[in-house]
Amino acid sequence: FLYRQAEIIDEKQWDDWLALFGDDGIYWMPSEEDQMEGDGEPNVFWEDNYLMQMRIARNTHPRAHSQAPHNRLCHVVSNVIIESEDANGDIIVRSRFHCAEYFRYEVRNFTGKYRHLLKKTDDGYRIALQRTDLVNREGPYEYVIQWWL
């Protein structure tokens, strides 16, 4: 599941990526490592399905000049550990990642930890919550993060 998600992001298959999330799924990138709550707190990302769709529409629009030329991403996901499973088959999965982004003739590297709460459904798992903790969250960036890592 996690490897497929990384491939979907790298290939910019946004409809497939959104389909990995449950109807009330959340993508969360906290601004602090010890942050326990995302709702109502400062975050890099705290996005539900509606906000994710809005970001895709904005960044893929033909006149999204801030995204020209389009970036290229390459994810590596490793150290996948199933932390827990409940009686319903829902699981919490921890993993590590490295993402290289090539954009405007430069490469930016992002590394960190994922924590997924995956809800079991009749047709597979869906993301209820994806938490992405960046190792280099305090690093200086010439431009903001436009896409999910």
Question: Can you say where each PLM-predicted feature lies in the sequence?
Answer:
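Short, aromatic-enriched amphipathic alpha-helices that serve as compact interaction elements
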Residues: 1-10
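Hydrophobic pocket/interface hotspot
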Residues: 5, 17, 52, 93, ...
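Aromatic-acidic/polar surface patches that form glycan- and anion
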Residues: 10, 45, 107
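Alpha-helical hinge/cap motifs
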Residues: 10-13, 123
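Short, well-ordered alpha-helical segments enriched in acidic and aromatic residues
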Residues: 12-28
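A solvent-exposed, acidic/Ser-Thr-rich amphipathic alpha-helical stretch
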Residues: 23-94
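A beta-strand edge to alpha-helix "cap/lid" segment located at domain peripheries
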Residues: 81-149
